[in-house]
Swiss-Prot record:
Superkingdom field: Bacteria
Residue intervals of the SprT-like domain: 7-147
GO MF: zinc ion binding
One Pfam family in the UniProt entry: Zn_ribbon_SprT
Membership in a protein family: Belongs to the SprT family.
Cofactor section: Zn(2+)
Subcellular location per the Swiss-Prot or TrEMBL entry: Cytoplasm
Protein name: Protein SprT-like
Record's GO cellular component terms: cytoplasm
Entry annotated with the keyword Signal: no
Length: 152
């Protein structure tokens, strides 16, 4: 789906569910990570997360578009457009838009695990962050630490 298709889809959803035209721009923003979309107050544009379209399909994207259009139309009308406002929640129910989008299934980042061993007492330390072995010593016997392994 490209920029023109998403613009057309947002305009269609606006007319179908809100019976009002969408007169601004709708674009995909690849930098969005934790949200399905956002409505920009100053420019009145809507930005959408392309990954939600890839992972969940057009149906979830339409739900996100309806949610952002609720912000848009209420803000344009001068009514309460924030999540906590009654006008916003009532309009969400009216158009059957989700209040929150689904959680993104993100590929778990490889969690590096560093293992260190005391050269004196053989106590092992497991850490998620690397330790400067020249600066830090064993907490039990004050012996030097040596790295054993780094797993990812």
């Amino acid at each position: 789906m490209d920029e023109q298709e998403i613009q057309r889809l947002v305009e269609e959803v606006s007319l179908q569910y809100f019976e009002m035209p969408f007169l601004h721009k709708a674009v995909f923003n690849n930098r969005l990570r934790t949200t399905g979309g956002r409505y920009l107050l100053k420019s009145h544009n809507i930005e959408l997360n392309y990954r939600y379209y890839e992972v969940y399909g057009e149906e979830e994207l339409v739900g996100i578009i309806k949610h952002e259009l609720c912000h848009y139309h209420l803000h344009i009308a001068g009514r309460g457009y924030k999540h906590r406002d009654r006008d916003f929640r009532e309009l969400l129910k009216k158009v059957d838009a989700p209040r929150f989008c689904k959680r993104m299934i993100n590929e778990e980042k490889e969690k590096k695990i560093y293992k260190y061993e005391c050269m004196e007492c053989s106590l092992q330390y497991v850490r998620r962050r690397q330790i400067n072995t020249k600066r830090y010593v064993c907490g039990k016997c004050k012996g030097k630490l040596k790295p054993i392994s780094k797993t990812s």
